[in-house]
Amino acid sequence: NDIDILVNNVGIFRGKEFKDETIEDWNDHFKVNLMSGVQLSKHFLPEMIKRDWGRIIFISSECATLVPSDLLSYSVSKASINVFSSGLAKLTKGTNVTVNTIVPGSTLSEGSKKFLEETALRENKTKDEVEENFFNDVRDSSLISRFLTVAEVANTILYYSSPLASGTNGASVRVDGGSMGSII
């Protein structure tokens, strides 16, 4: 149980219109995206509190706020992570344990690369054209108008895992290229 840093980064998503989503889709999104982190936190948080040091970090998504109509169950599961993390942080009051959520924007992950390739093939376009269309049509609020790199998100996680971030607890930290448009 000597875990100092827990990063809850597992996640699945299935893009379907609401009318096509099954209860199984909803259950799967919550089981993997939320409940895996709940179970791991339940297991490791008591020991972190006992040792008076630890970091629990959840990875959410901009979809928790910018909800696409074809990702409802995914988006709701990610919004639940934000709420759970905020509440869990309250249990660490007076300790050197922190619980925070990283909220990345559209990131060029393996899943995003596959999406770009499949869409390019289906629409007879280049991956660059598909990406440009995505940021013009779907995520036009992005101020950087590109996918975040995995390294950009990982560097944020590294910071919030470190003692340097000891003053931040219970936060949802955006790494979204400005896509959410909030000043807070």
Name every feature range the model reports, one short phrase each.
Residues 38, 53, 142-175, 180:
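C-terminal substrate-recognition "lid" of short-chain dehydrogenase/reductases
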Residues 61:
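Residue(s) in the substrate-gating loop at a strand-loop-helix junction
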Residues 41, 77:
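Active-site helix of classical SDR
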Residues 93, 98, 168-170:
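Short, small/polar-rich loop/turn modules that mediate ligand/substrate recognition or access, typified
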Residues 21, 67-75, 87:
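Active-site loop-to-helix junction immediately N-terminal to the catalytic Tyr of the SDR YXXXK motif
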Residues 46, 90-91, 166:
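Alpha-helical segment proximal to the catalytic Tyr-Lys
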